[in-house]
C-alpha cells in the first residue's frame, strides 16, 4: 500500500527505533557467554533497559494515539493488553536477583532464549499491524492537522523518555543515539523540533525533584492526608517536606480510617448523630472485642457484614498506631486539633501518648470513647495544656473527678501571684469522702459527707450533705427538704466519730436558724438552718478553698458573688517554681462533660481553682446527677464569660439561671446517661 505522508505518519518513526533495539538484543543473545557471570549480568541489564523502553513506547502509544482513536471509533479496544512486556521484565529482574551459580545461569539462558524468540515473533507483527491497520483508521477519523498534532506529541514524549532514562550517563546517551542513522534521526525529529516556538526551545527541562522545598510545601498544602502519605514515598526530599508541621495541624484519624479525608479546621458544633448510628458503632466495637482470629470462617451474609465491620476497625486501630509511632513524633508540636470522637478501638494509653506528643493542642474531641482518667496523665504538669480551648468528653462515662483535677493543673495558674505563695511549703490535707449506710427513709437516697482531716483549719464547720437520688424514684423539692431534716438525725444515729458534734456546730455561712431547703438565687442558700451552704470554704480541702462573699444590695436584694483562690499558710506541690505560669489567662472556652455521671462538685471546684475559667462560654453538664446547685453556682461565679444559652445541666438540680439555662441535653437519649432515662 502507498506510504502515508511523513507529517501524519505517527508509527513509522518510533517503530524504527524499536526494531533497532530488537536487532541489538538478538545479536547479543547469540554472542553472550552465559557461563561467564559478568557477561550474563551485563546482558540481563541491557535487556532490562531495552524492555523498559519498549514498555514506555507502548504507554505513549496508548495515551497519545489509541485512547483518542477509541473515542472516535468504538471498535478499537485492548490493543496492548497482551504484549507480555511486564512478564519479560519480571523474568529479567528474577535473573539478576536469584541466579548465582554457573549451572543456574545455563539453565536460565535456555529459558531466556525461548522467551525472547517468542516475544520477537509477536512484537514485530504487532508493530506491522499498527502501521498497516491503525494508521489508515487514524487517517479516516482524524483531520490532517489533528494527526500532525498527534505525531508531534508522540515524538516529544519519546524524546523526553529517552533523555530522562539516560541523562545520568553520557556514554549511554551517545551509545543510544549512535543506533540511529542520520536519515532516521532527521525523519524522527523533523516534525517535533521545527514547530516549537522560540520560548519552548529555550525552556530547559527540570525534574520535579529539583523544585525548591518552599514550592513543594506550597503545593502540598492543597493535598489531603492520603495524598501526603503517597508523596512521602516518592523520595527522601519529599518525605522531609511532607513531615512539615503546618501540613498536619488538624488530625481526624477516625474519620480518615472510614474514608473521609477532611483535614481542615474544626467547624461549628456538629449535630448529635442518631441513636441507630451510635448503636451500630457500639455493636461493631463489641464484635471487634469478641472477635476470634482463629475461629472457623462463617460464610453467611450476617457474618460477612460482621467481618467487614471488624476489618474497618482493624484499619482504624492500625491508623491510630501509625500516627502515634510515625507521624506525631515529627509533627506533634504543630498539631492544634485532634478529633477522636466515636472511636471503638481507642484506648487510654493511646490518648495519653498522643497528648504527650501534642503539647500545643487547642481542640480535643473524645466524644463517646472508652477512655478513663489515666488518659490525661500527661497533663499533670502545671500548664501542660495551657493552650486548650475546646474539650469534649461527652459520653465518656469512665471519667471521674480525677480528670478535672488534672485538667485544673494542666490549664495553668492565672491567679495573681502574692508574696505568700513563695512561703508556702507543706502539701494540703486531702478531702475524704465517706458514704455511711443510712436507714431507709421511705425513698432511696444516699448521703455523701465531705469531712476534714482532724485538727485541720476550719474543722469547726459542719460537714456538707449532698443527696444522691435514685434516678428511678425521683421526687420533688419538698420531699428532698424532708429528707434533709431526717437525714441529719440519721447521721447522728450512725455514730460516726465527730459527726454529731459537727452537726451541733453552726456553719460559718449561716445567718439564720430557720430550717429549710432552698437553693434558688433569689434568697441566699446559707440563710436556712440545716441546709448547709456547700461552699469550698466550709466543705472542701483546707489547702485550696473558694471563699464566696455576699454583699446584699440595698435595692435589689440580689447577691454579688466574688470568688477567689487562697491558701491557708500551706502550699500544693504544684505551686512551687511556677512564677512563669502565674498571670497567664486560661484559654478554655468549651467544656462538655455530658454523660460523665461520676463527676461531682469536688471536680467542678478543682477546675475553678488557679484563676477560674475566665473565657469559658460553653459548659455542658447534662447527665451528671451527682452535681448540686452549690457546685454549679461556684462554676458560674468562676466563669464570667459563660453564655447561659450554652449552659446545660440536669433538670432535677435547682441550680443557677434555672429559668434561662438550656437544661439537660440527654433527655430521651439512648446512648448517654440521663437521670430521667427511666421515663
Curated annotation (Swiss-Prot):
Stretches the record annotates as Hemerythrin-like: 1-159
InterPro entries: F-box-like_dom_sf, F-box_dom, Hemerythrin-like, Hr_FBXL5, Leu-rich_rpt, Leu-rich_rpt_Cys-con_subtyp, LRR_dom_sf
LRR repeat copies, ranges: 316-342, 343-367, 368-395, 396-426, 565-595, 596-623, 624-649
Cellular component terms per the entry's GO annotation: nucleus; perinuclear region of cytoplasm; SCF ubiquitin ligase complex
Gene Ontology MF term list: iron ion binding; iron-sulfur cluster binding
Gene Ontology terms: biological process: intracellular iron ion homeostasis; protein ubiquitination; SCF-dependent proteasomal ubiquitin-dependent protein catabolic process
Cofactor requirement: [2Fe-2S] cluster
Quaternary data: Part of a SCF (SKP1-cullin-F-box) protein ligase complex.
The protein, known as: F-box/LRR-repeat protein 5
Organism expressing this protein natively: Danio rerio
Amino acid at each position: 500500500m502507498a506510504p502515508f505522508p511523513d507529517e501524519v505518519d505517527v508509527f513509522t518513526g518510533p517503530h524504527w527505533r524499536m526494531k533497532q533495539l530488537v536487532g541489538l538484543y538478538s545479536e547479543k543473545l547469540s554472542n553472550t557467554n552465559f557461563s561467564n557471570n559478568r557477561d550474563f549480568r551485563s546482558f540481563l541489564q541491557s535487556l532490562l533497559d531495552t524492555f523498559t523502553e519498549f514498555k514506555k513506547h507502548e504507554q505513549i502509544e496508548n495515551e497519545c494515539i489509541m485512547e483518542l482513536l477509541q473515542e472516535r471509533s468504538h471498535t478499537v479496544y485492548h490493543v496492548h493488553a497482551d504484549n507480555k512486556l511486564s512478564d519479560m521484565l519480571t523474568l529479567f529482574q528474577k535473573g539478576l536477583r536469584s541466579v548465582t551459580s554457573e549451572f543456574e545461569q545455563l539453565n536460565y539462558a535456555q529459558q531466556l532464549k525461548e522467551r525472547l524468540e517468542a516475544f520477537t515473533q509477536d512484537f514485530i507483527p504487532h508493530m506491522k499491524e499498527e502501521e498497516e491497520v491503525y494508521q489508515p483508521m487514524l487517517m479516516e477519523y482524524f483531520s490532517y492537522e489533528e494527526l500532525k498534532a498527534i505525531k508531534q506529541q508522540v515524538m516529544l514524549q519519546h524524546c523526553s523518555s529517552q533523555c530522562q532514562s539516560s541523562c545520568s550517563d553520557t556514554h549511554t546517551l551517545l551509545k543510544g543515539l549512535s543506533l540511529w542513522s542520520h536519515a532516521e534521526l532527521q525523519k524522527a525529529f523533523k516534525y517535533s523540533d521545527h514547530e516549537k516556538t522560540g520560548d519552548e526551545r529555550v525552556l530547559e527541562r527540570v525534574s520535579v525533584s529539583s523544585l525548591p522545598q518552599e514550592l513543594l510545601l506550597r503545593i502540598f498544602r492543597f493535598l489531603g492526608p492520603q495524598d501526603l502519605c503517597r508523596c512521602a514515598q516518592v523520595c527522601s526530599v519529599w518525605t522531609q517536606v511532607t513531615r512539615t508541621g503546618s501540613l498536619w495541624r488538624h488530625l481526624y484519624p477516625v474519620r480518615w480510617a472510614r474514608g473521609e479525608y477532611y483535614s481542615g479546621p474544626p467547624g461549628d458544633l456538629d449535630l448529635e448523630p442518631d441513636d441507630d448510628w451510635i448503636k451500630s458503632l457500639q455493636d461493631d466495637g463489641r464484635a471487634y472485642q469478641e472477635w476470634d482470629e482463629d475461629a472457623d470462617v462463617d460464610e453467611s451474609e450476617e457474618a460477612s457484614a460482621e467481618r467487614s465491620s471488624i476489618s474497618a476497625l482493624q484499619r482504624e486501630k492500625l491508623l491510630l498506631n501509625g500516627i502515634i509511632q510515625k507521624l506525631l513524633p515529627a509533627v506533634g508540636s504543630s498539631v492544634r486539633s485532634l478529633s477522636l470522637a466515636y472511636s471503638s478501638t481507642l484506648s487510654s494509653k493511646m490518648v495519653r501518648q498522643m497528648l504527650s506528643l501534642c503539647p500545643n493542642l487547642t481542640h480535643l474531641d473524645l466524644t463517646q470513647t472508652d477512655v478513663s482518667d489515666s488518659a490525661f496523665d500527661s497533663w499533670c504538669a502545671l500548664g501542660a495544656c495551657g493552650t486548650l480551648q475546646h474539650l469534649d468528653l461527652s459520653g465518656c462515662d469512665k471519667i471521674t473527678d480525677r480528670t478535672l483535677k488534672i485538667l485544673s493543673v494542666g490549664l495553668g495558674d492565672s491567679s495573681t501571684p502574692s508574696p505568700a505563695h513563695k512561703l508556702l511549703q507543706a502539701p494540703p490535707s486531702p478531702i475524704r469522702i465517706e458514704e455511711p449506710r443510712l436507714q431507709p427513709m421511705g425513698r432511696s437516697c444516699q448521703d455523701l459527707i465531705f469531712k476534714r482531716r482532724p485538727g485541720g483549719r476550719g474543722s469547726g464547720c459542719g460537714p456538707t450533705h449532698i443527696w444522691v437520688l435514685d434516678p428511678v424514684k425521683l421526687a420533688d423539692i419538698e420531699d428532698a427538704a424532708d429528707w434533709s431534716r431526717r437525714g441529719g438525725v440519721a447521721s447522728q444515729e450512725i455514730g460516726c466519730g465527730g459527726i454529731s458534734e459537727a452537726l451541733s456546730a453552726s456553719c460559718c455561712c449561716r445567718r439564720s436558724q430557720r430550717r429549710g431547703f432552698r437553693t434558688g438565687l433569689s434568697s441566699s442558700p446559707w440563710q436556712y438552718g440545716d441546709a448547709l451552704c456547700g461552699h469550698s470554704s466550709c466543705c472542701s480541702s483546707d489547702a485550696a478553698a473558694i471563699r464566696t462573699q455576699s454583699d446584699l444590695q440595698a435595692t435589689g436584694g440580689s447577691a454579688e458573688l466574688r470568688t477567689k483562690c487562697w491558701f491557708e499558710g500551706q502550699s500544693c506541690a504544684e505551686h512551687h517554681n511556677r512564677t512563669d505560669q502565674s498571670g497567664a489567662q486560661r484559654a478554655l472556652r468549651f467544656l462538655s462533660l455530658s454523660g460523665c455521671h461520676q463527676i461531682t462538685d469536688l471536680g467542678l471546684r478543682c477546675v475553678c481553682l488557679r484563676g477560674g475559667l475566665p473565657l469559658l462560654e460553653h459548659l455542658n453538664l447534662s447527665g451528671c446527677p451527682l452535681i448540686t446547685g452549690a457546685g454549679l453556682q461556684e462554676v458560674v461565679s468562676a466563669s464570667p464569660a459563660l453564655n447561659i444559652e450554652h449552659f446545660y445541666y440536669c433538670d432535677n438540680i435547682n441550680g443557677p439561671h434555672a429559668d434561662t439555662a438550656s437544661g439537660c441535653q440527654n433527655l430521651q437519649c439512648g446512648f448517654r446517661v440521663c437521670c430521667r432515662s427511666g421515663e
